């Protein structure tokens, strides 16, 4: 057991199962990340990595009205799960990812790219998926020594933004639990 201040406790009603309530923490991270990156209606979104958290990002993007939602995932089972979670398109060939993203976004690139894996090569690739004025959500954790090469002038001239997000806070926890209790996520 751990003693914590009462203000940090979120009471659960009987209507929410423990198996659902335990998802509050990871969903709170996704809730916070969506707010930090400013995800909004009708924006195109690319989610790199359709593991559990990547699929949470897909569901949040759908809930917020993003369109199209594009997942990039090599694993066939995870690719299918991404479709079930709300991805409009799933790209399974990394060699054709940029070409397909451009085709799905009328040649512009994505408004928002979410890297949810934490692999340096995928971060490099994510930078190429953004449209001018686009935003990259750095969500996938790397080790402390990981570095990626960027071209600052390209980011400046294209007015792009890179935003990090790591953990949900109090309000995010409450919002995540509210959404879970109203069955907004599968």
Give the role of each language-model region.
Residues 17-95:
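Mid-domain Rossmann-like dinucleotide-binding core that forms the NAD(H)/NADP(H) cofactor-binding site
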Residues 1-9:
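Glycine-rich phosphate/adenylate-binding loop and adjacent beta-alpha elements
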Residues 1, 22, 46, 50, ...:
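Glycine- and other small-residue-rich loops at beta-strand/loop junctions that grip anionic moieties
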Residues 37, 80-81, 85-159:
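Glycine-rich cofactor phosphate-binding loops and adjacent beta1-alpha1 units
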Residues 8-18, 79, 158-159:
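Glycine/charged-rich beta-loop-alpha catalytic/anionic-binding loops adjacent to active sites
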Residues 9, 27-30, 54, 110, ...:
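A general structural signal for well-ordered alpha-helical segments in protein cores
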């Amino acid at each position: 057991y751990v003693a914590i201040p009462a203000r940090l406790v979120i009471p659960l009603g009987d209507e929410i199962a423990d198996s659902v309530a335990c998802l509050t923490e990871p969903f709170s991270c996704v809730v916070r990340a969506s707010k930090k990156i400013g995800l909004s209606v009708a924006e195109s979104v690319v989610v790199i990595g359709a593991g559990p958290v990547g699929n949470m990002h897909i569901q949040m993007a759908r809930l917020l009205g993003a369109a199209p939602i594009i997942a990039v995932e090599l694993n066939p089972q995870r690719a299918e799960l991404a479709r079930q979670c709300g991805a409009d398109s799933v790209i399974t060939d990394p060699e054709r990812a940029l070409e397909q993203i451009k085709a799905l976004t009328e040649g512009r690139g994505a408004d928002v790219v979410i890297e949810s894996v934490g692999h340096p090569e995928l971060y490099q690739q994510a930078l190429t998926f953004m449209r001018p004025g686009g935003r990259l959500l750095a969500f996938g954790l790397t080790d402390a020594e990981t570095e990626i090469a960027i071209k600052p002038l390209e980011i400046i001239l294209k007015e792009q933004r890179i935003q990090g997000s790591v953990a949900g806070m109090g309000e995010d926890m409450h919002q995540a639990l509210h959404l879970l209790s109203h069955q907004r996520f599968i």
